[in-house]
Amino acid sequence: GNYAADGITTATLKKKDGFIVVKFEREGYVTLETKIFTTDKRKAVSYTMRRDAFFDVSVASGLVNKYFSVKISKDLYTVDESGKRNTELAWKMIHQVILNYFDEIQTTDMASGFIQTPWLYKSFPEADKQIRTRVSVKESNLGGDLTFQIKISSEVAPLIASQRDESFQEIDRIVKDLEPMISEFQARLGKL
């Protein structure tokens, strides 16, 4: 059966040929799993967990992996007499912000109102993890105002998983280098 314990714990094995699997988990540390056989004569065992480098270079964020809205400042677009909107300046600004953090933009389509970066990969060999991040932007018109819906996707996978999509899972953390991007979107484009 499963037994969860916290701190110092004692366990007794009844089978002579059995073993137990001990798994140590704590947020911010690399998970450690080991087997202890009944033939092991030690009276006590102790393990030291290593810090997870991934947690040291990332921060939790409630805005990753979901769209957030930025209402665009009226200084960044114009509307002519016929009601046609010129959003070129707003689009230039959002490209500038993205290119401060990403080397390239994979897709940009002003006509359909969509921008997406390629995945940006970062590896953490000592934690056996890799994280990938990308930005997607959709233009929308909430209440008649120009608004961008922005999503920063952040996913993690084991390092050995290569770059296969099915290996990655969403995580509520973002690499610290990219965290200022959220504030920059808000400050340079308009208001939340």
Give each language-model segment a name.
Residues D6-T12, K16-L192:
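Ser/Thr-rich, low-complexity intrinsically disordered terminal regions
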Residues G1-N2:
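Short, ordered, surface-exposed loop/turn motifs in non-cytosolic proteins
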